[in-house]
């Protein structure tokens, strides 16, 4: 017994020494005389991690913004074995995402994505190369083109009507708006991804939401210290994620097979249709034989996971932050409701075609994306070669973070940046399509989010209906300034706590 214990102890100690030697060796290799961007001092093994102690690490974009005030808008940190550069100004965003876009077109695949997505076959983390070019073209031309997004209007109209009916059932009582909006967005994304005939749709939605939540809770330690990849294994989080994925994969296998069988029927003509879902589109393209790289079942699954991870939480989070800010700012609420109700005067049913001329509501959405950006650090990039930015050298394989949260609160760019003022987007035409570097909620350049049109469409119609059909009150006599606005950082940065409000039906007939 003692011999076994001694053998185990000696073996564990030797493994620890090997891991320690590798970490120190890697650290020494990276300690070169390159003119790196300024940053906090570094210690062996842990690098700059100790500087984050005592800072708001639950909201890392706060911590990075605080450090940037001392070290500048282009800052280098060594987080364990991860070499990281953080950009925190619109000027640095432009230098990187425009002038060096090609050189930083790679995405580092985080530990969670490696566990779940077959080494980055999904849209977000697919490595830069031929397959990325193909899936990017498919995304922009087929899956999320303006025409395709518009063709899915019937799904948004149907599901938003169901959401409004459910809210009517809670009239004059405290109801969970977070759940209502999340249910709407998840179902819209599911129907767009694989249609409405799936018997396990609700189960898949539940599993996907569980996976997104679990993925956001997985430690980043394996990315900072690859040798510590055993931690999620010991904690059970890796197995938990894989079990969810395994269960969801069974549903996706059934869905994809059902779609394949449909393509074999005599009624299938192989032509493009406005009622095609994402699986239909991918199978149609594969069947033409025109794709340079064949699409596998695993690739289709990865695309679906990308759509759910990027499309559900982002849209619902934006809608809920918009409603939260409107409840905190009654004058803005009054103004946007007046616009919506004047434009839609007397309508009992609102169609998507009815909401095309609501400039102030669109300004409310933009201001929400500025003040409550769902992805405050955007998705990281990685240098494929050494680059020079602002006189500094950034080595190959350096991860780059864009602190969009810091940029959207820069007082040199935004007057009263902490205040919710939609008028700023009326007075100055600023778009979110990646050319205004002070406002990049969907990123910019080659790796800009291809689904931004889809995401915005999933916000506009439900928000217009919430504003048109109901007057809203805070529960329990709460004052606007008392509304909890605490954020929670994860895959997206949403409300930490659900939003509970009291809806009162608006008298539409009284408008006439």
From Swiss-Prot:
What does the record give as EC number? 1.14.14.-
| Cofactor section | heme
Q: Report how it sits in the membrane.
A: Single-pass membrane protein
Q: Where are the transmembrane segments?
A: 1-21
A cellular-component GO term for this protein? membrane
Any GO MF annotation of the entry: iron ion binding
What reaction does this catalyse?
A: tirucalla-7,24-dien-3beta-ol + 2 reduced [NADPH--hemoprotein reductase] + 2 O2 = dihydroniloticin + 2 oxidized [NADPH--hemoprotein reductase] + 2 H2O + 2 H(+)
- What keywords does the record list, in alphabetical order? Heme, Iron, Membrane, Metal-binding, Monooxygenase, Oxidoreductase, Transmembrane, Transmembrane helix
Which pathway is it part of? Secondary metabolite biosynthesis; terpenoid biosynthesis
| Chain residues that bind heme | 449
Signal peptide extent? none
| Subcellular location(s) per record | Membrane
Q: Which Pfam families match?
A: p450
Q: What does this protein do?
A: Monooxygenase involved in the biosynthesis of limonoids triterpene natural products such as azadirachtin, an antifeedant widely used as bioinsecticide, and possessing many medicinal applications including anti-tumoral, anti-malarial, anti-rheumatic, antibacterial, anti-inflammatory, anti-pyretic and diuretic effects. Catalyzes the conversion of tirucalladienol to dihydroniloticin.
Q: What is this protein called?
A: Dihydroniloticin synthase CYP71CD2
Q: Which organism is it from?
A: Azadirachta indica
């Amino acid at each position: 017994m003692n011999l076994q214990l001694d053998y185990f102890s000696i073996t564990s100690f030797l493994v620890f020494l090997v891991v320690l030697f590798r970490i120190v060796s890697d650290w020494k290799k990276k300690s070169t005389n390159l003119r790196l961007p300024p940053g906090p001092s570094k210690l062996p093994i842990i690098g700059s991690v100790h500087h984050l102690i005592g800072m708001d690490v639950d909201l890392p974009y706060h911590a990075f913004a605080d450090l940037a005030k001392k070290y500048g808008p282009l800052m280098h940190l060594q987080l364990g074995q991860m070499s990281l550069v953080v950009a925190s100004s619109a000027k640095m965003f432009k230098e990187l995402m425009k002038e060096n876009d090609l050189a930083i077109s790679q995405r580092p695949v985080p530990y969670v994505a490696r566990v779940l997505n077959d080494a980055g076959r999904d849209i977000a983390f697919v490595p830069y190369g031929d397959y990325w070019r193909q899936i990017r073209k498919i995304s922009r031309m087929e899956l999320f083109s303006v025409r395709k997004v518009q063709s899915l209007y019937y799904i948004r109209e149907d599901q938003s009507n169901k959401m409004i009916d459910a809210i009517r059932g809670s009239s004059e009582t405290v109801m969970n708006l977070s759940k209502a909006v999340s249910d709407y967005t998840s179902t819209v994304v599911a129907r767009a991804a694989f249609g409405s005939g799936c018997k396990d749709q609700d189960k898949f939605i539940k599993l996907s939401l569980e996976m997104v939540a679990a993925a956001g809770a997985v430690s980043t330690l394996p990315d900072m210290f690859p040798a510590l990849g055993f931690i999620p294994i010991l904690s059970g989080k890796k197995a938990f994620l894989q079990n969810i994925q395994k269960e969801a994969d069974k549903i996706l296998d059934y869905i994809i097979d059902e779609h394949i069988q449909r393509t074999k029927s005599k009624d299938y003509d192989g032509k493009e249709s406005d009622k095609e879902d994402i699986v239909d589109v991918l199978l149609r393209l594969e069947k033409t034989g025109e794709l340079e790289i064949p699409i596998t079942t695993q690739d289709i699954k990865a695309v679906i996971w990308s759509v759910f991870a990027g499309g559900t939480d982002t849209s619902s989070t934006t809608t809920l932050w918009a409603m939260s800010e409107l409840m905190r700012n009654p004058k803005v609420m009054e103004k946007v409701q007046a616009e919506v109700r004047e434009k839609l005067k007397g309508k009992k049913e609102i169609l998507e075609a009815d909401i095309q001329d609501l400039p102030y509501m669109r300004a409310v959405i933009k201001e929400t994306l500025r003040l409550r950006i769902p992805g405050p650090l955007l998705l990281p990039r990685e240098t494929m070669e050494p680059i020079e930015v602002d006189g500094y050298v950034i080595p190959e394989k350096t991860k780059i973070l864009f602190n969009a949260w810091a940029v959207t609160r820069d007082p040199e760019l935004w007057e009263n940046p902490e205040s919710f003022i939609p008028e700023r987007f009326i007075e100055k035409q600023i778009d979110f399509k990646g050319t205004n570097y002070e406002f990049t909620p969907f990123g910019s350049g080659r790796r800009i989010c291809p689904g931004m049109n889809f995401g915005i469409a999933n916000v506009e119609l439900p928000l217009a209906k919430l504003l048109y059909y109901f007057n809203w009150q805070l529960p329990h006599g709460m004052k606007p300034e008392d509304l909890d606005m605490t954020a929670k950082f994860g895959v997206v940065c949403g409300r930490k706590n659900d939003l509970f409000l009291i809806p009162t039906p608006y008298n539409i007939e009284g408008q006439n």
